[in-house]
Design a protein with these regions (language model features):
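N-terminal hydrophobic or amphipathic helices/low-complexity stretches enriched
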Residues: 1-5
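Helical cap/lid subdomain of alpha/beta-hydrolase-fold lipid enzymes
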Residues: 91-247
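A broad structural signal for short, well-ordered beta-strand segments within beta-sheet-rich domains
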Residues: 9-10, 188
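Serine-dependent carboxylesterase/thioesterase catalytic core
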Residues: 7, 13-19, 23-24, 28, ...
Length: 249
């Protein structure tokens, strides 16, 4: 983990990588957050070894200590499955000064790629129990989560490196692992789609700048290339501040 203690008077941000990755995948984003004046906790956790509920308990001591070391709000930024882990963590160990949550390519409603691969022994052996929680059949742990009553901003990607998953497995638009439609979450404060791949989201210049914008303002910055939030029917508005294919990370 990395804690930049020079910024302990500021807000803090917990960064959670996706399945099969490490904190290194979030390092570029972390540096940008630090340059914006935020304190960071960039965790590596055993994403392939345990289900989400147990992973939450693994990361809790470090996050609790980090929260006590800062004076401001405690925000979360999760890439892919890291966003799901953030949701489970907040439900079980809600910080007293909870800030905002940004999700990058998170399969909030599952992924058809995981549906396709879940019966594969190779998939099960490599991605472990958490990999089986990424399907479109709502996992029990995720189904029991309360509605979000905190500001969640979601960045989805619309480019893919895998043409098979992009064209034949996932509804379009998608990032090669998660469709834009399945990245959405009931009660989210804001949502944007950018021209980035799933794996590339934590490195993407626009995704990084939009993450910083949401953590600061509770909403994403709009340009002519970024249309207003379009929620599907039934999604209530919430206040901005209140193996050729791979599974989502």
């Amino acid at each position: 983990m990395t804690i930049e203690r020079a910024y302990t008077a500021s807000d803090g941000v917990v960064l959670l990588h996706g399945i099969g990755c490490t904190s290194r995948s979030m390092r570029k984003l972390e540096r940008s957050l630090q340059q914006a004046g935020l304190t960071t906790l960039n965790l590596t956790y055993a994403s392939r070894k345990k289900p989400l509920a147990l992973l939450t308990e693994d990361i809790h001591p470090a996050i609790a200590a980090f929260g006590e070391a800062i004076r401001g709000s405690l925000h979360f930024v999760g890439h892919s499955m890291g966003g799901l882990l953030a949701r489970v963590y907040v439900a079980r160990h809600r910080p007293p000064r909870l800030g905002r949550v940004v999700m990058l390519g998170t399969p909030n409603r599952g992924s058809e790629v995981a549906d396709l691969l879940q019966s594969s022994r190779l998939y099960r052996n490599f991605y472990g129990p958490a990999g089986l929680q990424l399907t479109t059949a709502e996992d029990e742990t995720l189904a029991r989560l309360p509605p979000v009553d905190y500001a969640v901003g979601i960045v989805a990607g619309t480019r893919a490196l895998d043409p098979i998953a992009w064209r034949f497995v996932l509804p379009r638009p998608n990032d090669g692992r998660v469709s834009v439609a399945r990245s959405k979450l009931e009660g989210m404060a804001d949502h944007i789609a950018i021209k980035a791949t799933h794996t590339g989201l934590p490195y993407h210049r626009v995704a990084i700048s939009q993450t910083i914008a949401f953590l600061s303002e509770g909403r994403f910055e709009r340009t002519t290339l970024m249309p207003p939030l379009n929620r599907p029917p039934g999604y209530p508005a919430s206040q901005p501040n209140s193996p050729t294919a791979h599974p989502p990370h």
